[in-house]
Amino acid sequence: MALWMRLLPLLALLALWAPAPTRAFVNQHLCGSHLVEALYLVCGERGFFYTPKARREVEDLQVRDVELAGAPGEGGLQPLALEGALQKRGIVEQCCTSICSLYQLENYCN
């Protein structure tokens, strides 16, 4: 019997045991639980840095924006004019609003 006939069952068995091809990580939008899962995948046992804003902090920012706007006709500073200067670029802005890479995710690992 030919050699290839004897190797055919072995090759078929190896083909069945081979891991399925996985899609490589491409730059993509990651939000919510998908972002957290990606951080767990990238950071592994090191863990990652995450400090969510408390509800009070968010409310304080909203009040500050209203105070900056002033009453109609007063010519107060518009919050949109200061938004770029006051806003930090966090992981949500990098990965959910914009497209994120593995290297950017690694910046948030411990």
Curated annotation (Swiss-Prot):
Intrachain S-S bonds: 31-96, 43-109, 95-100
Propeptide segments, given as residue ranges: 57-87
GO cellular component terms attached to this protein's record: extracellular space
InterPro entries: Insulin, Insulin-like, Insulin-like_sf, Insulin_CS, Insulin_family
Gene3D superfamilies associated with the record: Insulin-like (1.10.100.10)
Single annotated GO MF: insulin-like growth factor receptor binding
One Pfam family here: Insulin
Function: Insulin decreases blood glucose concentration. It increases cell permeability to monosaccharides, amino acids and fatty acids. It accelerates glycolysis, the pentose phosphate cycle, and glycogen synthesis in liver.
Family assignment from sequence similarity: Belongs to the insulin family.
Binding partners and assembly: Heterodimer of a B chain and an A chain linked by two disulfide bonds.
Protein name: Insulin
Gene: INS
